């Protein structure tokens, strides 16, 4: 019985470890420039009013609310995207959705609230 319980515990541990794996890389705000140099496009998933108030130069806007409705229009399935929002919460959700659809994404763990570079 002890062996069976031990085996069950090991299986549960392995299953929980597998479930926590993300299908994308996460970088800090300082990693954006390197990813842009590697050919990634900046995808800002804030709402349009937030985006218009200030965004990273050359970023495109695709709100998380659109992605949650399976609206991926305008995104290139062969593209590489670095995903940013205001604080890192929405970008993680968007990265989850995009990676499930086989998009090549990198999540920014921080957001525009930590960005010190130029904005448009």
Which residues does each predicted region cover?
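Rhodanese-like catalytic fold shared by cysteine-dependent sulfurtransferases
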Residues: 4-6, 18-29, 35-40, 49-80, ...
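C-terminal motif of bacterial Sec signal peptides marking the signal peptidase cleavage site
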Residues: 13-17
């Amino acid at each position: 019985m002890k062996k069976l319980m031990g085996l069950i515990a090991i299986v549960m541990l392995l299953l929980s470890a597998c479930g926590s794996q993300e299908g994308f890389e996460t970088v800090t705000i300082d990693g954006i420039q390197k990813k842009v140099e590697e050919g990634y496009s900046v995808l800002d998933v804030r709402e349009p009013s937030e985006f218009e108030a200030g965004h990273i130069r050359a970023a495109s806007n695709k709100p998380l609310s659109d992605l949650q409705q399976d609206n991926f229009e305008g995104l290139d399935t062969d593209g590489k995207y670095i995903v940013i929002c205001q604080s890192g919460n929405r970008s993680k959700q968007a990265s989850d959705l995009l990676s499930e659809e086989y998009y090549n994404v990198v999540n920014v763990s921080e957001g525009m609230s930590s960005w010190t570079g130029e904005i448009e």
